[in-house]
Amino acid sequence: MSEPFHRILGRPEHPLFLFGDHASKHIPDGFDNLGLSGDDLTRHIAWDIGTEGEISGLAKRFDCSALIAGFSRLLIDANRDPEMKTLIPETSDGTSIYGNVNLDADARQQRIEAYYRPYHAALGQALDRLTPKLSISVHSFTPKPDLGAQRHLDLGLSLIHI
């Protein structure tokens, strides 16, 4: 199994903490790319394009800590409540995610335990340990999703003031 997250350590007293729930397009071995083509795995449906590099670059530049999910949102969406139906999507922007269709409760729970919970535990520990003044969840937005209207936003930042 691949790691469910990648931790970047900066100065512990730094007031800024960055994290990326959708920064990776990685589908671990054993999931047969969820039945998708390589082209689909490079599209915005698999990840927030460019955010891993932005998070890494900003963390290095500011010497702050960061956390990056190590799996694609198509495997399990780290930015969803575990009870939500969209936690493991069966479709994304008109594309069927065959490896997620009719997933049984045991397989769903295995993904939660192997990827979702470790990532969120690491996120919670980082926020507790670092006590940042500003946590930024970094996301990117495709200007025109296949089935959507034109977006006029290149980078989205969800701010959590602590």
Provide a role label for each language-model segment.
Residues 1-160:
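N-terminal catalytic or cofactor-binding beta/alpha core of small enzyme domains
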